[in-house]
Amino acid sequence: MIRTRSASAWILALAALTGAATPARERVVDGDGIVDATIAGVRGRIRIEPSGTAMPLVTTAWAERATLKPGMLAFSYAVGTERVHGRTGVAPIDLGTGPFKRRIGWTANPYTPAADGVIGPGGVPEDVVRFILRTPVAGERTVALPTTDQGGLAGGWGELYALIDLGGQPLRIRFDPYHARTLATASAAARIAAAQGGVLQGVVEKVEIAFGIERPVRTMTLARPLTVGPLQFATLGVRTADHGSTAGIADAADPIDPDEIVVTAKSKKPGRDRLSIGADLLARCSRIVFDKPARQIRLTCA
């Protein structure tokens, strides 16, 4: 999640985003999602990914090659309790269909070693972004989910989320085919467990989230599968130390084994309740379509 560090500069940032090229109707993203791009005419490689932020996040090396000038608005990207700090500047970026101006963020640590930067569907100029994950198969269903940004001052710079109803309240869903496991923040896991009968099991593992930062994760199994569009599943990972806690919030009639915690607490900060659908579940899906004018994400899965 991107957070600003200078709220007073927000109005200036909005003014700097004028002059973008007329958007094309649709962009198709397939394969590894990596495309040749330029920033201020300087070449690099950027990955367009469903879970990427609208503000391109690139390496300091690329920003320096492009002689980007940092503005007064810095940012930080929260990965659990850790933060990656960066700088921003406005420059023309070309993803292969013509240049447009965009505020660009850069960090010393790369978001991914696979490319010089990443960008999400909210940051490309096309109205519709179609991610092709694999060849369609018989029996697939397409379900449209409403979408939202992360909200707050940096809402227009962050990720685009799908929304589902969980216990009468919205739960934010992101789609990340570049990470193996489906993961929930601790507060999201608490809500899911309360609604679906969840139990934490097994040992803590370290899982890379972004920027090479690893966070502790345990496995949760559900008595009643969770539905996200055409997907149903009963197993997911829980980021036990991130945005909430799974410790000390159990509510069960029977004694609780230390390695099996029944989580029933409700989150007090719903904005931090996020579920990231990983490659383990997206392997069932052939495409994800972000339709920005319709404010929909359409997920097609078997």
Residue ranges and their predicted role:
Residues 12-21:
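Hydrophobic h-region of N-terminal signal peptides that target proteins for export
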Residues 1-11:
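Bacterial N-terminal signal peptides that target proteins for export
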